[in-house]
């Protein structure tokens, strides 16, 4: 509650600690999704592909008591990390909810069973079509039949072990080119036995032209600009131990700090974090340097804040780009 109050009041120096952790356990992927920098094989500048188990353990020792859930995904495919079952088991042993998002186009039934045994609570499985032809237009290199086979295997393994976990949600990434297959995908989800089915916008150039994209744009105009939540709610840890302010910053150069077993609470009070929070507080605009150089100045959320319009016009560093920081 204190964390949410700090967020609503846009407190620059929050007293409460984030209750969500986002850990990028694998900075690599087996697919080549065109709107993802990892899929495009764009270097993030990081020297470690997989996060180390000891790094996760140190983080939990430091802040685990505050965490409600840990999302074990961000820029890569988490199932490629050979330690992923151990990471899930470690977090689960602390009584923390574990969430994983995967393309599930991977030929490894053993890791699926190990994740179930480790106590994984929730699994998102992303697809972008009900036919292979449509699916592979975005999920390049993926095999839809393999994804569905793996889902069936997880569901059957749950039944065999009298377990309801992990809860499996089939997440349909919506683009203009695949809206026509949404209904077929819903039926497919029922047939394979997933617990939940959901359509989500996929971003990218096509998103603004899709029906869902136009609907979200209208909501934004009606209810005002969205403000950042992750600066208060989330702890974001990259595969090499870099600490980011949110899950949208991809490049190493945009990290706010390094985690080497140091005090995370203290790190989150450094100048970069404080200035980022002040960007969303209209009363703190006078505290912002006129020539501020900051990764958040590329963020679409920052550029949508009414109180920053004049400030951003006058700052040559404030070039609007993608929320990954890719201008």
Regions found by a protein language model. Give the residues of each.
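Short loop/turn motifs at secondary-structure junctions and domain boundaries
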Residues: 14-16, 225-229
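Conserved C-terminal portion of the radical SAM core fold
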Residues: 65-73, 93-101, 117-129, 145-214, ...
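Short histidine/acidic/glycine/proline-rich micro-motifs that form metal-
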Residues: 76-78, 105-106, 172-177, 254
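Conserved alpha-helical substructure of the radical SAM core
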Residues: 1-122, 133, 137, 141-149, ...
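Cys/His-rich metal-chelating microdomains
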Residues: 28, 32, 39, 231, ...
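Short, well-ordered alpha-helical microsegments
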Residues: 81, 107-110, 178-182, 244
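Generic structural signal for small/hydrophobic residues in well-ordered secondary structure
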Residues: 21, 25, 29-30, 52, ...
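C-terminal accessory region of radical SAM enzymes
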Residues: 156-167, 191-192, 196-226, 242-306
């Amino acid at each position: 509650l204190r964390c949410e109050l700090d967020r609503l009041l846009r407190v620059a120096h929050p007293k409460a600690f984030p209750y969500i952790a986002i850990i990028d356990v694998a900075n690599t992927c087996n697919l080549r999704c065109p709107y993802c920098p990892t899929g495009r094989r764009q270097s993030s500048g990081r020297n470690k592909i997989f996060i180390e188990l000891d790094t996760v353990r140190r983080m939990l020792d430091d802040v685990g008591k505050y965490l409600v859930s840990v999302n074990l995904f961000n820029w890569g495919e988490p199932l490629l990390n050979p330690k992923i079952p151990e990471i899930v088991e470690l977090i689960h042993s602390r009584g923390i909810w574990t969430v994983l998002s995967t393309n599930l186009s991977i030929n490894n039934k053993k890791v699926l069973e190990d994740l179930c045994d480790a106590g994984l609570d929730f699994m998102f499985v992303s697809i972008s079509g009900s036919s292979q032809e449509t699916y592979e237009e975005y999920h390049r290199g993926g095999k839809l039949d393999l994804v569905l086979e793996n889902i069936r295997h997880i569901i059957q393994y749950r039944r065999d072990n009298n377990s309801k976990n992990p809860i499996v949600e089939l997440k349909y990434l919506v683009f203009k080119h695949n809206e026509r297959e949404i209904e077929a995908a819903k039926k497919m989800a029922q047939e394979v036995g997933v617990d939940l089915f959901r359509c989500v916008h996929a971003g990218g150039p096509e998103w603004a032209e899709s029906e869902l994209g136009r609907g979200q744009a209208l909501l934004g105009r009606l209810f005002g600009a969205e403000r950042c939540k992750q600066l208060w709610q989330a702890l974001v840890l990259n595969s090499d131990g870099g600490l980011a302010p949110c899950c949208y910053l991809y490049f190493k150069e945009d990290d706010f700090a390094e985690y080497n077993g140091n005090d995370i609470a203290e790190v989150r009070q450094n100048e970069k974090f404080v200035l980022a929070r002040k960007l969303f507080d209209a009363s703190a605009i006078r505290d912002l340097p006129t020539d501020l150089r900051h990764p958040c100045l590329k963020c679409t959320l920052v550029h949508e804040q009414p109180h920053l319009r004049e400030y951003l016009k006058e700052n040559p560093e404030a070039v609007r780009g993608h929320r990954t920081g890719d201008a």
